[in-house]
Amino acid sequence: MTELKAKGPRAPHVAGGPPSPEVGSPLLCRPAAGPFPGSQTSDTLPEVSAIPISLDGLLFPRPCQGQDPSNEKTQDQQSLSDVEGAYSRAEATRGAGGSSSSPPEKDSGLLDSVLDTLLAPSGPGQSQPSPPACEVTSSWCLFGPELPEDPPAAPATQGVLSPLMSRSGCKAGDSSGTAAAHKVLPRGLSPSRQLLLPASGSPHWSGAPVKPSPQPAAVEVEEEDGSESEESAGPLLKGKPRALGGAAAGGGAAAVPPGAAAGGVALVPKEDSRFSAPRVALVEQDAPMAPGRSPLATTMMDFIHVPILPLNHALLAARTRQLLEDESYDGGAGAASAFAPPRSSPSASSTPVAVGDFPDCAYPPDAEPKDDAYPLYSDFQPPALKIKEEEEGAEASARSPRSYLVAGANPAAFPDFPLGPPPPLPPRAPPSRPGEAAVTAAPASASVSSASSSGSTLECILYKAEGAPPQQGPFAPPPCKAPGASGCLLPRDGLPSTSASAAAAGAAPALYPALGLSGLPQLGYQATVLKEGLPQVYPPYLNYLRPDSEASQSPQYSFESLPQKICLICGDEASGCHYGVLTCGSCKVFFKRAMEGQHNYLCAGRNDCIVDKIRRKNCPACRLRKCCQAGMVLGGRKFKKFNKVRVVRALDAVALPQPVGIPNESQALSQRFSFSPGQDIQLIPPLINLLMSIEPDVIYAGHDNTKPDTSSSLLTSLNQLGERQLLSVVKWSKSLPGFRNLHIDDQITLIQYSWMSLMVFGLGWRSYKHVSGQMLYFAPDLILNEQRMKESSFYSLCLTMWQIPQEFVKLQVSQEEFLCMKVLLLLNTIPLEGLRSQTQFEEMRSSYIRELIKAIGLRQKGVVSSSQRFYQLTKLLDNLHDLVKQLHLYCLNTFIQSRALSVEFPEMMSEVIAAQLPKILAGMVKPLLFHKK
């Protein structure tokens, strides 16, 4: 019978035999040249005469080039038929898709003997000569010093097999495609003693002959069986304990996959909790070994089939030694579950690393494996693989759920030990699979484990970081969070997207309460504006929008901000700020009745009567004069916005003795309408002169008066006139002082909201000036008398508009007053959410209110009459809101039925009507009122 003789790890494949696992495997890493004693003498294993060739590259270092090992010929050779039989059984097992729960009977003896060999204590007399120096120098010494060449100087506790993998459940190649029942070494063993397997009665560096046999897959206790074969995408492995399918010897055993009839053994030691040494995984290759193949392919560390780039040996050794010597480092003791793997850190460099074990919360459980999913052990790993990022150190209790992508290679993570300071990382691309949207760390006792939710574009969710600040090092917090900061102040969009992490990982939302800056509520119009009265957005106009009970609570006029809590009129105890002045309730009621009743009080003395708590009812004339001098304005509760200096000046005026004689009316009016120190009334304010200069010219409607009026022709002419007036309003507003300082969107909004008010107000002014309010003077070529109004289809609407010129006639409105009121009409309606240039808008409106007061003072020569005049004019402005609402409703109905009514609407006017009138009629705008209804 032909026998197969193995000539080392580079032995070619024999036809008809099992395929050599080394052939065709990608070049992943350098071979681990640790002294893994895998040969067993005939005394130790009488029934087994060969060691699997799959362990040859791991257990025995490759000889130097040109060196022919003397023990190349085997003493006990295994027949090819046995190898083929073992291979056929492995094929049958894999084809059946099942997994053996216990090793075959033939292998049980081998397992026991191997365990006896592995677990036997190493005596001083068992040290044997080490392999040649070339083998030692070519090894990878990542977790300890190189083995000395001197045999006596090599203690049994110095193992050099580099455990590079933390996830050992890999493809089994020709063996069973599942992770078989397995056992592990005791956790009490240190990593070095676990890796070194001293053979009782056999040399450490024995050159015993070997025979090829199928390589077993190295498995681990935390991997599930039933993982799919290499042809399909298997589910993500969970870190769960599995029942051991064999007798445990001494608390640990070596894993023996089914199909390894030749006694192939792959040992995967469990790491000690006191150390951070990762675990080793051996992967079986599928193709025969080609002649001349580098020995690097003989040992295939499963790096999820990611090409391995060179590693800095000195850096790895130094970092590993630092972690091993660190007494405060805890290798996963703080994990919530006893089976949770130790904490891992992301590899931020472009060097390839192995995928560490992820806890159960890292991935959402899949009901069934999906073919289109990205398994951890597929030939291609997409960018969707996340790397959990976590701060190292005993004090690091807050972990970051954000993950990043390794630059230059498919992402992976070194388990349990971080590399040196990494270069900056680019943000990870959004995940392509929702289930893999985030990888969170196992929750520690004082840490927060969650995943950030999807970002949203509108809000900055700040999260409050719990726990101690992370230490400075290679895994410092991301740039958006300063070390030790209490929260991330950057928008969520700037962070990597982990949209499905909150739901998939089962994160508790209570762990991340959304906070604002400095404990304040989150900014935004929806949170601060949409309240009745809009107190947050329009502080200058709170007096017009809120009742006295609310106005008395203004922080600017709280009692704490005033020097005294007395009435500025009579000296009694003040009850609040009424009509802009701190007064008592009696003076408040007196002033309101005196102004609304339009009483003409006369002083029996010389207008210098003493007004105090006892004698305040003796002379109502002097009491009213004193109210006006203090600054009380009926309906002008807005004027309590005057600063504290103004109030102190009023207090000083009350404290000083009144001058003897009748005070000058102009001085009293100046004291009443002075809004800033040194600003007195002028004869013609320059702003009013400017308003006169920019007033639009007369606009014609283009109506044909020779033809009889019809409903459609009259409405069409009015629409044409409205289009021209709308263009005139736009041109006029651009020349208006202060209007161009507003945001362009605010300018458009104000014009669209107020164009109807401006048109009907201009109609009333023209009707008042040209025809004394007897007719509706739309344009020089379109004047409707009462008869034409009755013949029209909108007679009731004409009566409504006719009220404005009649009111002008009653009040005898001056041009200066009209110009100031016209500007205030432009600024009397705003959106509910406010304007973008809210501050500039408030300043502009306040300035034109002052101009209106100046315009009133040009003709009114008395304080009482001026206050009454201001009340009447502002009341007219408030009444225009209801009148214009009727016009809006009629205009919208006509626009909707324009085809049926044969009424034409110009283009610009149609756009404004369609876009804004439904919103205005639905109450989605906020009118600014001077008086409470």
UniProtKB/Swiss-Prot annotation:
UniProt xrefs under Pfam families: Hormone_recep (PF00104), Prog_receptor (PF02161), zf-C4 (PF00105)
Keyword terms, alphabetized: Cytoplasm, DNA-binding, Isopeptide bond, Lipid-binding, Lipoprotein, Metal-binding, Nucleus, Palmitate, Phosphoprotein, Receptor, Steroid-binding, Transcription, Transcription regulation, Ubl conjugation, Zinc, Zinc-finger
Composition bias, Low complexity: 232-246, 335-350, 434-452
Region annotation (AF1) ranges: 456-546
Record-listed cross-link Glycyl lysine isopeptide (Lys-Gly) (interchain with G-Cter in SUMO), residues: K388, K531
Chain residue ranges for the region called Modulating, Pro-Rich: 1-566
Keyword Zinc-finger: yes
Ranges spanned by the short sequence motif Nuclear localization signal, renumbered to the chain: 183-187
DNA-binding region: 567-639
Region (AF3): 1-164
Binding annotation for progesterone: R766
Cellular localization per UniProt: Nucleus; Cytoplasm
GO cellular component, one term: nucleoplasm
Compositional bias segments (type: Pro residues): 418-433
One example GO MF annotation: zinc ion binding
Protein name per the record: Progesterone receptor
Organism: Pan paniscus
